[in-house]
Amino acid sequence: MLLSLTQMLSSRASSRLFLVSYLLLWENVVSTSTCAEKDATIQDSLEKLLTLTTFMSQVVSSETAKLFTEFNNQYAQGKRYNDRIPGTCHTEFFDTPVNKEQSLVRTPETLLTLVHSLLNSWTNALNHLVNEMSTMQGDTSSLISKAREIQAKFDELTTGVKIVQSMIGERDIATYSAWSGLASLQSSNEDVRCFSFYTMIRCLLRDSRKVNTYLEVIKYKMVDQNNC
């Protein structure tokens, strides 16, 4: 199963195709509440989508870690950024469980809304991350390519989460936390720009790991335990 999912997610088009396929499949099925008894078709579709979405979140988390490592190696060596007082992430507004144990006490519906909100909060930020990174000194082509792939998969994850919410009859009440770091990314001071990118990618890594953890818990509760 892991190998086939890796192959499915090897290109942007293929992963989006699978999400759209599940969306089209769901248009022919009447939504039901999480706690209601589901027929085999609904449960099977839900399991497949959650498996795909959870694995995709693992891929995103891994790709974000690679982006952070590459940026750190290329721009942050010897600058002791870890010793500086870091700026807070723009998603600090959300009441997020800090680990899997805390996540397990939340309902799947609550976690789905939280995941959706976190993903929404990075839409604008990721767009600027991709567009502004070329202003850094040196060759940024690899960094930009990685950031674009992450941006695309965030969009696909958002689609997957919205489909899951529709499948369980959950009303979409996701919100977002506005990102306001553009001025720092466009600063004329190279060190300010560099530290801003460093902090931004660090926050992206933190949130991508949270999304992965929450989706794993959602899958555990809704598929492995088959309860609510």
Swiss-Prot record:
Gene3D superfamilies: 1.20.1250.10. The keyword Secreted applies. Residues 1-31 form the signal peptide. Disulfide bonds join 89-194, 203-228. Keywords: Disulfide bond, Hormone, Secreted, Signal. PANTHER family: PROLACTIN-2B1, SOMATOTROPIN,PROLACTIN. One of its GO terms (cellular component) is extracellular region. SUPFAM superfamilies: 4-helical cytokines. The gene is Prl2b1. CDD domains: prolactin_like. InterPro entries: 4_helix_cytokine-like_core (IPR009079), Somatotropin/Prolactin (IPR001400). It is found in: Secreted. Expressed specifically in placenta. Expressed at high levels in trophoblast cells from both junctional and labyrinth zones of the chorioallantoic placenta the last week of gestation. This is Prolactin-2B1. One of its GO terms (molecular function) is hormone activity. Belongs to the somatotropin/prolactin family.
